[in-house]
A protein has these predicted regions:
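A nucleotide-sugar donor-handling region in carbohydrate enzymes
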Residues: 51-107, 112-114, 141-142
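C-terminal "capping" alpha-helix adjacent to the active site of nucleotide-linked donor transferases
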Residues: 216-217, 224-242
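Donor-nucleotide binding loops and adjacent catalytic segments primarily
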Residues: 91-97, 101-175, 208
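A short, well-ordered alpha-helix in the C-terminal region of glycosyltransferases
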Residues: 242-256
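A donor-sugar binding/catalytic signature common to diverse glycosyltransferases
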Residues: 168-209
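C-terminal alpha-helical cap of glycosyltransferases
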Residues: 255-273
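Nucleotide-sugar donor-binding patch of glycosyltransferase catalytic domains
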Residues: 199-227
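Active-site and donor-binding regions of nucleotide-sugar-utilizing enzymes
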Residues: 1-68, 73-76, 82
């Protein structure tokens, strides 16, 4: 392919692309890696023949250096997410009115990814049974059976059930707390919304560092059991100053300009203004 620049966003594509360039005698074509694991990315992300490696955090930068990359060819830019997740938060009450959500109590947003996987139902019931003075919004994703069960349940507290939604940026900006698994994309989107996180599950290895990154910086809490989720939520609801401190920490970590910064770097590589 007559490329002037190759960009890899997956660790398994980097070495094959470089081998292909070598076999074609086109090693002058630069390969830029955009690392999409926040902290504990696999070593395959960090190839010394890459012209430039763009990483989301300082911890990922250190990981690259530990993998013997030249620090001058590694740059911290944040994790790129869709532009819809990078807009200013704005007026929460106006957003809630638009979404037809009650405005008088804190909103807990419970998500389990687009497929509605994991212990979402168990966590929803535990939160409801705790009778917290809050509104619970549950996103069941594409899991239609789960959505039907949740809709049929007799909830003790105000609870809103959704399937797969396209308004997730507005949902995040309108909520006060998100309860989610520790995926890098959702974490980055929540940071951009200044949304404190209760993280309840993680993939071994690659997502373990995500939990440490969020909790060590004060933007969230690790709560892998339903009772721990309830404890974290109760503290943030009964002590709004604790929640506000976590929200401020999330805003401090946010990198809403990541995609634009990456685009500018790639354009500069191509000599394009």
């Amino acid at each position: 392919h007559p490329s002037d620049l190759i960009v890899s966003v997956h660790p398994l594509a980097i070495a094959p692309a470089l081998r292909a360039l070598r076999s074609l005698g086109k090693l002058q074509v630069p390969l830029v890696t955009v690392v999409t694991d926040l902290v504990t990315g696999h070593a395959l992300w960090y190839h010394r023949k890459a012209a430039l490696t763009l990483v989301p955090t300082r911890a990922a930068f250190q990981r690259a250096v530990d993998c013997r990359l030249d620090p001058k060819r590694v740059k911290v830019v944040g994790l790129p997410v869709a532009d819809r997740f990078c807009q200013p938060v704005g007026d929460k009450n106006a957003l809630r009115a638009q979404l037809e959500w009650p405005a008088e109590q804190p909103v807990i947003l419970l998500v389990g990814g687009g497929e509605g996987m994991g212990p979402l139902e168990e966590n929803a019931h535990a939160i409801d049974e705790a009778r917290l003075p809050a509104i619970l919004v549950v996103i069941a994703g594409r899991n239609k059976d789960l959505k039907a069960r949740l809709e049929a349940h007799n909830w003790s507290r105000p609870t809103l059930i959704y399937g797969f939604v396209h308004e997730m940026p507005d949902f995040m900006r309108a909520a006060d707390i998100i309860v989610t698994k520790a995926g890098p994309g959702t974490i980055s989107e929540a940071l951009n919304a200044g949304l404190p996180m209760v993280l309840y599950s993680r993939l071994p290895g690659q997502e373990e560092g995500n939990v440490t990154y969020v909790t060590a910086n004060g933007a969230g809490i690790w709560a892998p059991q339903p009772d721990l989720i309830v404890t974290a939520l109760r503290d943030w609801i009964e002590h709004p100053e604790h929640r506000q401190k976590a929200a401020a920490a999330a805003r401090q970590l946010a990198r809403p300009d990541a995609a634009q910064q990456i685009a500018h770097i790639l354009a500069a590589k191509l000599g394009v203004e």
